[in-house]
C-alpha cells in the first residue's frame, strides 16, 4: 500500500498490482490491500492474479481497480475473455501473457506463474485474445525477466504489429535506454518495470525526462 502511494507521487502513469501466486495457489486476490491501494493511488490501477470469474471482476472494479488482468483462466477457458469484455467493456480487460522462446523459432505461452508450457503460439494466442475482446496485452518475456539486459524486442514487436490494441512490454529493464528501445524498436505502447523503481535504481521522473528528450 505504501508503494502504491509512492508511485502515485513519483509520477507513474499507471500502477499494475499483481498477486503473482494467486493462480498457482488457487486462491483469490488480496482485496483488502487493493482497497487501501486504490485510496492512495490516483492513477489507473490494473489488478491481476487468480481472477477466474465474472463476480471477481465486478468486485475488483467496485473496489477501485480500473482494469483487470487475466492469464491462466483465459487460457483454460477462452470464452472467459469474451464474456468479461461483453460484460465490462474491452477497456477493462487486459490479457496477460508470459512467453518464452521456442527451440526452432517462435514463442510459447506459459501459465501458472510461468510453470506450465501450454504449447500455444504467442502470436496466435495474442490475436485470439484480442478477437475475443481483450483491450490490452501485458507481455512478459520469461527469457528476459529479472535479467536487466533489456526487454524482448523481437516478440514485443511481433505481437504489437499483429494486434490492434496497446501492448505493454514487461520483463528485462535495466537502464533507461531499454525503455526507449521497447517503445521504438519493440513498437510497445508502454513499458513496465518493478525492481528498478522499487529499489531506487531509477527514478520515474528522470526516466520520463529522458524519454521526452529522446522523442
Question: Which residues make up each language-model segment?
Answer:
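C-terminal helical cap(s) of enzyme catalytic domains, especially alpha/beta-barrels
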Residues: 81-88, 180-215
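Hydrophobic faces of well-ordered beta-strands that scaffold small-molecule active sites
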Residues: 15-17, 45-49, 68-70, 93-97, ...
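Catalytic cores of alpha/beta
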Residues: 41-67, 154-191
Amino acid at each position: 500500500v505504501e508503494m502504491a502511494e509512492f508511485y502515485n507521487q513519483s509520477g507513474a502513469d499507471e500502477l499494475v498490482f499483481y498477486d503473482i501466486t494467486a493462480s498457482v495457489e488457487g486462491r483469490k486476490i488480496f482485496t483488502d490491500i487493493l482497497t487501501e491501494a486504490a485510496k492512495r493511488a490516483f492513477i489507473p490501477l490494473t489488478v491481476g492474479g487468480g481472477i477466474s470469474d465474472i463476480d471477481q471482476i465486478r468486485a475488483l472494479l467496485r473496489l477501485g481497480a480500473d482494469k483487470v488482468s487475466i492469464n491462466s483462466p483465459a487460457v483454460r477457458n477462452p470464452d472467459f475473455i469474451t464474456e468479461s469484455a461483453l460484460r465490462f467493456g474491452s477497456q477493462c480487460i487486459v490479457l496477460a501473457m508470459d512467453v518464452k522462446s521456442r527451440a526452432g523459432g517462435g514463442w510459447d505461452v506459459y501459465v501458472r506463474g510461468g510453470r506450465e508450457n501450454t504449447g500455444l503460439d504467442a502470436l496466435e494466442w495474442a490475436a485470439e485474445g484480442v478477437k475475443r475482446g481483450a483491450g490490452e496485452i501485458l507481455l512478459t518475456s520469461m527469457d528476459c525477466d529479472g535479467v536487466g539486459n533489456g526487454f524482448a524486442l523481437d516478440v514485443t514487436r511481433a505481437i504489437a504489429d499483429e494486434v490492434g490494441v496497446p501492448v505493454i512490454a514487461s520483463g528485462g529493464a535495466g537502464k533507461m535506454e531499454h525503455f526507449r528501445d521497447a517503445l521504438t524498436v519493440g513498437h510497445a505502447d508502454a513499458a513496465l518495470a518493478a525492481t528498478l523503481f522499487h529499489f531506487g535504481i531509477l527514478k520515474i521522473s528522470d526516466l520520463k525526462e529522458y524519454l521526452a528528450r529522446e522523442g
